[in-house]
Amino acid sequence: MHLESIVLRNFRNYENLELEFSPSVNVFLGENAQGKTNLLEAVLMLALAKSHRTTNDKDFIMWEKEEAKMEGRVVKRGQTVPLELAITQKGKRAKVNHLEQKKLSQYVGNLNVVIFAPEDLSLVKGAPGVRRRFLNMEIGQMQPIYLHNLSEYQRILQQRNQYLKMLQMKRKVDPMLLDILTEQFADVAINLTKRRADFIQKLEAYAAPIHHQISRGLETLKIEYKASVTLNGDDPEVWKADLLQKMESIKQREIDRGVTLIGPHRDDSLFYINGQNVQDFGSQGQQRTTALSVKLAEIDLIHEETGEYPVLLLDDVLSELDDYRQSHLLGAIEGKVQTFVTTTSTSGIDHNTLRQATTFYVEKGTVKKS
């Protein structure tokens, strides 16, 4: 799979831009604040209809314009698939093969991407929300139904929180409704939990040998999904019964707080090296090796799930890796993954990579191919 071309209209600082890409390595070179990351963000948006930088759609639309628009041609399995995404003040519209998609979950998955940015180095050390967003993004593009389930979960969670708030304020409401919402909540929560736990299991299977190799055989990586329920066995009904029991035990505390206290929105993923929690005890080098191993594992996992390698976006991250980790990253993707790199200088990039790369010079919203 690779992105053959992209067209941007009124997106960020690009009023009118058309680019054609190499199926191997593409380097966006320029000073800071010139628009390099905006280009990678456009590719990410074209793939996921979401950004790694903001959740506010208005941020994408150029000042005093009505909408931002992206078009791309994706080559997969020998066929070209046109994608279109328009962003307005009222929301997003998406097309595949020029046909409008009723839901964004039907659009996502036509272009698979893995992004590795400096903030991804905090995947291990950062707050649990960082890891939950990571799971939502990666599972969502491989299993579009997951995005539908996630949206349903967020809707029920919001309703349940509103109802708990009313009970907290001692308004006259039907107490039976909380039990109904809790039952609905548990059904969708277990669905998400199962998909996340399965994903983590597969991710570990790919990440562990990569980490073992990067650490020169000195470290063993384990990844655990820390769920609100006890993940005994494979029966979701058992998990659901456990969740309902726990929710019943904290019902009064939730009413007192006016918020749902357990569920996938509170779950986390834990990383262990040689049995030690990397979040708490890992060195910066171990945390970076773990993040790199996970990103490389994503590439292989997407390939297993979809039959195609994803597009890799490296947003100013090569300068954050030492020569050894950088060479391992570039060696792992060479010849099989279309890669987009942003950088302020080519001095930190492997010479073999540069020789096969197409370089674009970025300055004040203009892009010139070398």
From Swiss-Prot:
This protein's UniProt keywords: ATP-binding, Cytoplasm, DNA damage, DNA repair, DNA replication, DNA-binding, Nucleotide-binding, SOS response
Annotated PROSITE patterns: RECF_1, RECF_2
Annotated GO CC locations: cytoplasm
Residues that, per the record, bind ATP: G30, E31, N32, A33, Q34, G35, K36, T37
Domain of life: Bacteria
Database matches in InterPro entries: DNA-binding_RecF, DNA-binding_RecF_CS, P-loop_NTPase, RecF/RecN/SMC_N, RecF_2
Chain segments annotated as transmembrane: none
GO biological process: DNA replication; DNA synthesis involved in DNA repair; double-strand break repair; SOS response
Predominant location category: cytoplasm
Family named by the database record: Belongs to the RecF family.
Cited function: The RecF protein is involved in DNA metabolism; it is required for DNA replication and normal SOS inducibility. RecF binds preferentially to single-stranded, linear DNA. It also seems to bind ATP.
Name of the protein this chain belongs to: DNA replication and repair protein RecF
Organism encoding this protein: Listeria innocua serovar 6a (strain ATCC BAA-680 / CLIP 11262)
